[in-house]
């Protein structure tokens, strides 16, 4: 289960760094397969320490700052995705491990090695992988549903939870290994993957997020690109220039399919068609295509005739139950992924119509007196809020602010100017958002609480508008998390409805 390096080792010593959900899963997996364990966490008493003991895992636990001393006798380092490789106490440890030839793997690499080992017994599932700054969970959940509707046994895991190795252990124990794995993967998880080769994978978008963890946008984008193996079908968002830099080289045998909110121009690509006031999900087809194989590389000076493209209408966008153009793009990505592994189209289109979306992701929670109240509390970065504004495409009173995580808020200016009636600012970094939007001419007011901001937004909104909570920030300056922030917003909207004699 641990690759060629450990094939002849009976009980290799593994150092697990970090005892979060993935760290605990890695510890359980390694213990299950007879490894000796040392578990280290910067916290003296991490919350999962009792769980480690409850599972009867014989591991030496070390709490406190990391140091290279932890490597004594270690043959493999298993690092949790929450730990930045740039952390001051982690850099010398990782450097020492590499100098000593000790592999540094994350949970995704352990999962990849396990699938390879199971493959020796004939297990050959399809693997679909999803990453991106925003839209991962929606696209992952939707892709899993589509696979089910096509009659496949599916396991959905990864960043979406449960942990990859926990889901794999459960499948092995129940002798119910799935036909298809659908994995939501963060840049953190991809950073320490080395042999991961999914059948199809998508990068939905790349915008500013977790830059402190990676050290910069280029490193963050490079981590996202690790989702593709040499033979992986690459599903790419053609509307995102950073994503398109991940397109395969011209001489590569890798297949690429694109999607976007624009009309597709190339055979096999997906997009949106606007016709007579309706928006359609479509796929481009070359009318002149033959069944003969087309060479990947063109000869020098070869004249290529532009394809004669027709657009096949798949379904109206308003047949989707998830709101916004960005969610239409997520639906196209999910459809493209499932088609890329050979699933039939008809049941997939039925599945697209069925999916209701995920909580706190551009979720309509009420319409009161003609005003929509939309919960996008999961919009914790600028890219998510830009997508929500452009996706809803209606007049909006925006509620934004919180812990900005060092982001540049300038990209908010254009969509705010286009769509917003006003902006209600909350949280620690409200002044930074105000500074970024000061030249838009849009009215902005500061509020001490989310409740106050929601009521002020209601007073300004007109019928046909939306009051949108999409903070572009993390929540921890004011709330326990984004779900707590959403609960406060919903509670306030419920109070407003009750005051107006309406139930939601």
Swiss-Prot record:
One example GO MF annotation: ATP binding
Name residues in a coiled coil.
none
| Catalytic activity entry | UDP-N-acetyl-alpha-D-muramoyl-L-alanine + D-glutamate + ATP = UDP-N-acetyl-alpha-D-muramoyl-L-alanyl-D-glutamate + ADP + phosphate + H(+)
Which biological process annotations from GO are given for this protein? cell division; cell wall organization; peptidoglycan biosynthetic process; regulation of cell shape
Q: Name one Pfam family in it.
A: Mur_ligase_C
Give the superkingdom in one word: Bacteria
Instruction: Enumerate the Gene3D superfamilies for this protein.
Output: Mur ligase, C-terminal domain, Mur-like, catalytic domain, NAD(P)-binding Rossmann-like Domain
One GO CC annotation, please?
Answer: cytoplasm
Xref: SUPFAM superfamilies = MurCD N-terminal domain (SSF51984), MurD-like peptide ligases, catalytic domain (SSF53623), MurD-like peptide ligases, peptide-binding domain (SSF53244)
State the compartments where it is located: Cytoplasm
**Which residues are listed for ATP binding in this entry?**
132-138
* Principal location: cytoplasm
- PANTHER family the UniProt entry points to: UDP-N-ACETYLMURAMOYLALANINE--D-GLUTAMATE LIGASE
Family listed: Belongs to the MurCDEF family.
Q: Outline what the protein does.
A: Cell wall formation. Catalyzes the addition of glutamate to the nucleotide precursor UDP-N-acetylmuramoyl-L-alanine (UMA).
Q: What is this protein called?
A: UDP-N-acetylmuramoylalanine--D-glutamate ligase
The species is: Paraburkholderia phytofirmans (strain DSM 17436 / LMG 22146 / PsJN)
What gene name is given for the protein in this entry? murD
